A protein has these predicted regions:
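Asp-based, Mg2+/Mn2+-dependent phosphohydrolase catalytic module
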Residues: 1-7, 20, 118-121, 130, ...
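Alpha-helix N-cap/helix-initiation sites
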Residues: 19-23, 39-42, 64-68, 85-92, ...
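A metal-dependent, Asp-based hydrolase signature
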Residues: 51-98
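Alpha-helical elements of Rossmann-like donor-binding domains used by nucleotide-donor carbohydrate transfer enzymes
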Residues: 24-28, 48, 74-77, 115, ...
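Hydrophobic alpha-helical core bundles mediating ligand binding, dimerization, or RNAP-core interactions
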Residues: 22-30, 49-53, 75, 96-100, ...
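Active-site neighborhood of HAD-like aspartate-dependent phosphohydrolases
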Residues: 1-9, 14-51
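Short, surface-exposed acidic
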Residues: 34-46, 81-96, 150
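Short, acidic loop-to-helix structural element flanking the phosphoryl-transfer center
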Residues: 8, 68-72, 87-129
Length: 234
């Protein structure tokens, strides 16, 4: 008898290649808005955006800032640096809407994502997506990437009213899925939000470490460096 019946699976950069897809979308945004007027090239704009975005998402996951602040600020900062003039909130929202429209059409997945999900489905696991991503974008990304139909349940932080790694997020996920703590495994690439959140809640964890030169800072149940390695565990 298998140890787990339910899998909580992170989406962004665990299955969906958010980093790669965002790079493509930001280059398209750069061209559409003619940002070469303020940046030497698209890579400079991309680097400015990504550094800001990582910082803001970390703070958002900790509940320190709101969704609306993140959406505006992640474009206000890089555009301010490039233009030397701070854009107003309306302009930042327009840029954000265009970026999210571009991103949500991208279909790139992490290597081995479809093979893994096909395998897990064949083994009879119940699969539940657990994500801090925004509601209106995640469903479009799920469909663009061909991953939507694999999931039994979609758990989003906006529906839960709180973000991973909060215990309240996992309370909500357990209620929605009717999963049991001892038979549920959390799979994710973000050690702080996915792995520590689930571990502190009492769930087993599988850390997808995409950068193996930086091993897990504390013990986990499983650590893999590719999605295909999860097939050997499950």
């Amino acid at each position: 008898m298998k140890q787990y019946t339910d899998l909580f699976i992170d989406f962004d950069d665990t299955l969906y290649d958010t980093y790669g897809n965002a790079e493509i979308a930001l280059h398209e945004l750069f061209d559409a808005l003619h940002l070469e007027r303020w940046f030497p090239d698209a890579s400079v704009f991309y680097d400015e955006y990504w550094q800001t975005n990582i910082d803001l998402w970390t703070r958002y996951s900790r509940g320190e800032i709101t969704r609306d602040y993140l959406i505006v600020e992640r474009f206000r900062r890089p555009l301010s640096k490039g233009q030397g003039l701070e854009p107003d909130e309306k302009r930042c929202l327009e840029v954000s809407d265009l970026f999210l429209d571009l991103l949500s059409t991208k279909s790139g997945v992490v290597e081995g994502a479809h093979e893994l999900m096909d395998y897990l489905r064949s083994q009879g696991y119940r699969m539940h997506m657990c994500s801090n991503g925004f509601h209106e974008v995640q469903y479009r990304k799920l469909r663009s990437s061909g991953l939507y139909d694999y999931f039994d349940t979609i758990i989003l932080s906006e529906d839960a009213g709180t973000n991973k790694p909060s215990a309240r997020f996992f309370d909500y996920a357990m209620q929605q899925t009717r999963a049991g703590k001892t038979t549920t495994l959390m799979i994710g690439d973000n050690f702080q939000t996915d792995i520590l959140g689930a571990k502190h809640y009492g769930l087993a964890t599988a850390y997808f470490n995409r950068y193996p030169q930086y091993p897990a800072p504390e013990p986990v149940d499983y650590e893999v460096t590719s999605l295909r390695q999860l097939m050997d565990i499950l």
